[in-house]
Amino acid sequence: MWSYIAGGVFLALAMYFIVQGIRCGAAVRESKNRLAAYNAQTAALSYGEITYVDLGEGEVILSVHGIFGGYDQAYDTCKDFCSDYRIIAPSRFGYLGSDVSGDGTPASQAAAYVELLDKLGIDKVHLLATSAGGSVAIRFALDYPQRTKGLILYCSAMPPVEKPEKYAEYAGPPPFLCNDYVMFLLSPMFELIMGMEQSTIYSMLPINDRKVGVILDASVTNPDMARDFGEYPIEDLQVPTLIFHAKDDKLASYIETERAVARFPNCTFISFESGGHLLTGHAEEIKEAVSDFVEDRSH
């Protein structure tokens, strides 16, 4: 009897994994069709290629996406602004068509952005960064204040308030999870683990094409502000900053953001009781605040 039960359970599990594999394959194919609709462009830079979306007119917002991102997520973060501003949305190192320069540090990523802006004939930008992209945007603002009009951070990585005695050398998912099928299987747990809807998986696919970037973020980008604390003199920032964060964010600590805000000169901090890491439900408030921030510095 028990052998029949065990066999039935095994068969049910096997069928489940097969069905999920079929669903995952279909979702990956659809994700590649979705990416094609962005009409992304590729520029040859000194170290390799960078792929980006360039849409809209007016003041320029350079969108710096987070982990599991790419030009698609970089653009989608700013799509509500496309009718008013020019959006430059590149894939960062290792994501969707963008090569890695050197060790892939935030400083190298910022330098690549400058090279892209030079190629596009753009002098100054507002930086808008989400999550892991915050380290790169902050690095850009510190290294190139003459190219930066303002810094906007959405539930972003934040610098520690003092040099940490220890920190995570690897801050991200282990490489074996950076796989279309494995992450698709885990997506029903997104709400519990990350506070995100299961459907978020569809904006992350194809994960196999983002894996290099994810591992680079986990090993280099995310630990950088702790590892090289002295290289991030936040108090010396020469540009204004606008920071958004939700108190129920499960991925980027709201408490750490509250502490870090005091380090930013000329900073506006807008917090939300809810919304999670994606600031769900606050599109209108964010659009108004960002528009006011950009317009104040466009004259």
Located regions from the model:
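Conserved HGGG/HGGXW glycine-rich cap/lid loop of the alpha/beta-hydrolase fold
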Residues: 54-97
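Conserved hydrolase catalytic core segment
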Residues: 124-162
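Alpha/beta-hydrolase
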Residues: 171-173, 177-232
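Conserved alpha/beta-hydrolase "acid-adjacent" motif
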Residues: 250-256
